[in-house]
Amino acid sequence: TGDKLYFKGELTPASSVGIGTFTLSKKCNAGGNAMSLLFGDNFENQYSLQGKNYAFYALFKGCANLEGVSSDFLPATTLSNYCYCSTFENTSIEIAPVLPAKILATRCYQRMFYRCKSLSYIEAMFTTTPSSTYTSNWVYGVSSSGTFVKHIYADWDVTGVNGVPTNWTLTHDIVNSGYIIGKTGENGHYSD
């Protein structure tokens, strides 16, 4: 209990399989910075996934034992095609990591939180209008109630499986702080 395991590497995403998929046999949380899996020791100040299509495709797909993820786990502000497709599909997370990118790429968030039945909080800063081109079924099967925070300048109004989940409360991030509301710990990051 309380043990930590660290991963880093300089992995190259392969078309349609990304860098691989974790299998978790015990309940756990994911923390740190996912960019360390792509850039090794040079992950700090890396905010672009340009040229890294499928980067984190299905990274935790089907990991029902994944219960939480730190708010700053996915710091990329420049996305690539399919980069987060199915990343958390069928996990048990309650709070999504902050999604700071303002411009979406093709299928970047497709099925990202598909069937995450416990998910009830998403903070997504994109100003691109969500649609099947970018966010196909990204929130299908999430909790029937929750809070969705979007960028103050995001003027889109899309609800349902490709946008803000139906029946969720919608708020705006006035300061674009990247911190989460609810379960917070030191510096506003997720804690349990």
Regions found by a protein language model. Give the residues of each.
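Surface-exposed, short loops/turns at beta-strand junctions within beta-sandwich domains
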Residues: T1-G2
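Structural signature of tandem-repeat unit edges
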Residues: L5-F7, S15-N53, K61-S80, E89-T106, ...
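Register-specific detector for alpha-helical tandem repeat solenoids, activating on a conserved position
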Residues: Y57, C85, Q110-R111
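A structural signal for leucine-rich repeat
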Residues: S136-G141
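Extracellular/surface-exposed low-complexity segments
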Residues: S143-D192
